[in-house]
Each structure stands twice: as C-alpha cells, then as structure tokens.
Amino acid sequence: MSRRNAAVKRPVLPDPQFNSRLASMMISRLMKHGKKSTAQRILSDAFSLISERTGGNAVELFETAVKNATPLVEVRARRVGGATYQVPMEVRQERGTAMALRWLVTFSRARNGKSMSQKLAGELMDAANETGSSVKKREDTHKMAEANKAFAHYRY
C-alpha cells in the first residue's frame, strides 16, 4: 500500500441534461471505451422510454430504482486462524449507491431486448417497482449478511 497521502476524492458534478448527480454517475458506469456521448444517449433514450410508458418523471423513477437497489449490509471475507468467515458489514451510502448503479448496468446488459436503452429502461422500471434482478441481488446480499450474523463480532 502506498505511503503517500490518500487521493482527494473529486466531487461528482451533476449531469447538465438531467441536473442530477446520480445520472452523471450512471453515465460513467454505462460508458465503454471512453465513449461518453454514446452512454449519455443511451441514458436519455431510456429516460424518454420510461416517460412514455409511465407518463411520469423519469429522473424521479430512476432515483427510486437506485434507492430500491442500494444494499445496506454486505458480507466481506475475513481470515481468522486458517478459516475464512463471511463477515457482515454495513455499507456506506456512497459505496451502496455505487454498487446499486453497477448492478443496474450489469443486469440491464444481461437482459433480453433490442437496444441497451430499452434494456436499461426495463431494468430501471422493474427496480422502481421492487422487482427485477438488481433488487433480487440486493435481497440476496441482505440474506447472506443475515445468515452470517454470528460472525459479526469479527468486524474490522
């Protein structure tokens, strides 16, 4: 590990189109090979699809979807005397949001659909309705933490 000072965390600026920090973070997660304009187009197309289907505000639905997919606890491997325990730990809000966005993108890519914007719109709507793969992943993470509650005293 580096002996230098920890790097200063740069603030995430809100996306100019949607005026949302979460949207800006999502664009960064969607981006492949530095193609930011493509990622922005995918997100804006997904938001317009959501607005058409629901008739509501797509940005609010997106924020609800991220909130529903955000885990509160996770398990982390901890080695104690030759045995590895899955130790449940609380997730900081920043990390939880990052995990939720990562899961939303991963499960959107895994969906069957025509375009990425359609797949993303479907996953976001499912997550907002507390269904969908990303919310299931959060529930599985919480179940794992609950099952390993006995090892909570190994927290670091």
Curated annotation (Swiss-Prot):
GO terms assigned for molecular function: rRNA binding; structural constituent of ribosome; tRNA binding
One record GO biological process: translation
CDD domains, sorted: uS7_Bacteria
Alphabetic keyword roster: Ribonucleoprotein, Ribosomal protein, RNA-binding, rRNA-binding, tRNA-binding
One Pfam family it belongs to: Ribosomal_S7
GO cellular component, as recorded: small ribosomal subunit
SUPFAM superfamilies: Ribosomal protein S7
InterPro entries registered for this protein in UniProt: Ribosomal_uS7, Ribosomal_uS7_bac/org-type, Ribosomal_uS7_CS, Ribosomal_uS7_dom, Ribosomal_uS7_dom_sf
Function in brief: One of the primary rRNA binding proteins, it binds directly to 16S rRNA where it nucleates assembly of the head domain of the 30S subunit. Is located at the subunit interface close to the decoding center, probably blocks exit of the E-site tRNA.
Record-stated family: Belongs to the universal ribosomal protein uS7 family.
PANTHER family hit by this protein: RIBOSOMAL PROTEIN S7
Subunit (UniProt): Part of the 30S ribosomal subunit. Contacts proteins S9 and S11.
Name of the molecule in the record: Small ribosomal subunit protein uS7
